[in-house]
Amino acid sequence: MNNLEAILRLKTIDAAKKLLGHFLVSKYNNKILIGKIVETEAYLYNDPACHSYSNRTKRNSMMYAQAGTSYVYFTYGMHYCFNVVTADVGIGEAILIRALEPIAGIEQMQLNRSKTKLIDLCSGPAKLTQALNINLKDNGINLLDKDSSILLRYNNDLINEIDIVQTQRIGISKAKDMPYRFYIKDNIFVSKK
């Protein structure tokens, strides 16, 4: 078991904190695009804001997969959101990756986003999926497999607990006051402070 696999087997709230500082990697157009995870949100099976709360559907079926599987969905008729499945198979929990700090493949991210400012590339769920060219084709990928087109990569430079801000989730209408959003303190790439 690698370190990321161990993180994703933690309770989803703990995993959402521990994913901060690790890397999301996309292999696109013969390039490697890398972003450091700087903001996450946890979604639990008993959480009214979670896609698996009511029942299992074709759209949310990947939320019930093995921890470390990607769950990508289309929202508002125009945006993709990228999640990492956590918990045991059949539970239906995931972590939304809300923001990344661009690390590598920045020129391609700028082309993908039609933006040049670093701060505009991955500072929100829809922005980061566009920057890394993540869409429904990436739903159900094993993010712990080094040969996957999208994967998680461990960062030995871990984030201290005192550098993690815990606050309410944003951009949702149900259970929005739950303190399930986490971000790296003073990081300029988070979507909203």
From Swiss-Prot:
UniProt record similarity statement: Belongs to the DNA glycosylase MPG family.
Q: What is its EC number?
A: 3.2.2.-
Q: Does the keyword Cytoplasm apply?
A: no
| Protein name, as recorded | Putative 3-methyladenine DNA glycosylase
Keywords, A to Z?
DNA damage, DNA repair, Hydrolase
One Pfam family recorded for the sequence: Pur_DNA_glyco
Enzyme class, spelled out: hydrolase
One biological process GO term for this chain? Answer: base-excision repair
- Leader peptide range in chain numbering: none
Q: Does the keyword Ion transport apply?
A: no
UniProt-listed InterPro entries: Formyl_transferase-like_C_sf, MPG, MPG_sf
CDD domains, sorted: AAG (cd00540)
One GO MF term = alkylbase DNA N-glycosylase activity
